[in-house]
A protein has these predicted regions:
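Terminal connector regions
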Residues: 45-48, 157-189
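Short acidic/proline- and small/hydrophobic-mixed sequence motifs that coincide with surface turns
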Residues: 99, 110-115, 160, 176-177
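Beta-sheet-dominated interaction scaffolds and their linkers
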Residues: 48-108, 184, 188-189
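Short, solvent-exposed loop/turn segments enriched in Ser/Thr/Gly
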Residues: 86, 95-103, 144-146, 156-164
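Membrane engagement elements in two modes
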Residues: 1-76
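Surface-exposed binding patches on compact interaction domains or structured appendages
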Residues: 55-57, 111-143
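Beta-strand-rich interaction surfaces with strong enrichment in secreted/lumenal proteins
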Residues: 89-91, 133-139, 152-153
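Short, acidic/polar linear motifs in exposed loop/turn regions
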Residues: 108-111, 155
């Protein structure tokens, strides 16, 4: 075999190796993509085995909404309003989904109160979401309403989050008070 023929044979073998490596890489990429899509469409699961359940809703940012994971705990009261829970500890929350922790606000006083626009204090993390009042914002004695807080993070916003929610309460006589709620979570894939 001449030197020219030998080099041509080496080029054919190199071409075959390159083709085989490219095909193997493409198959691996397709497999990883299918796995990621399957995890995303099922709601995903954490490393600890927690299964997340979709609500069937899509958030304002176009992300699937999951049932709020974690633990709701405690009760906090002021002169005229009681909030349950006082804290949402969400645990690990996947990226690119939305969760909506919700608090029940109950007028325990003797006069009507008005729930004002909540303000978020970021203790750690970033990017608070929108609040939604699910019910009336003016509560007669003994009346409840729900306050929900939509949270969704994407890559670059991941990591631990700690937020305090200051909810202003105005009385019929014009006096005000604030009830402080909290939400904690670790947003990551």
């Amino acid at each position: 075999m001449s030197n020219t023929q030998h080099r041509a044979e080496e080029r054919r073998h190199a071409h075959r190796r390159t083709w085989l490596l490219t095909a193997a890489a493409a198959i691996a990429l397709v497999g990883a993509s299918v796995g990621a899509i399957a995890a995303a469409t099922s709601g995903g699961s954490s490393a600890s085995g927690t299964n997340y359940k979709r609500t069937g809703e899509i958030s304002a940012m176009g992300m699937p909404v999951l049932e709020t994971p974690g633990t709701a705990s405690g009760t906090i009261s002021t002169e005229s309003v009681m909030a349950t829970p006082s804290t949402w500890a969400l645990g690990r929350v996947p990226l690119n989904v939305a969760v909506r922790p919700t608090w029940l606000l109950h007028n325990t006083g003797t006069d009507a109160i008005t729930i004002g626009e909540p303000h978020v204090q970021i203790n750690q993390g970033c990017c608070p979401g929108a609040f939604t009042m699910q019910g009336p914002s003016t509560l007669d004695p003994g009346v409840d309403t729900n306050l929900s807080f939509e949270l969704s993070m994407h890559p670059g916003m991941d990591g631990p989050h700690d937020m305090t929610i200051h909810v202003p309460v105005q009385h019929a006589d014009g006096t005000t008070e604030t009830i402080n709620l909290s939400v904690l979570g670790n947003f990551s894939d």
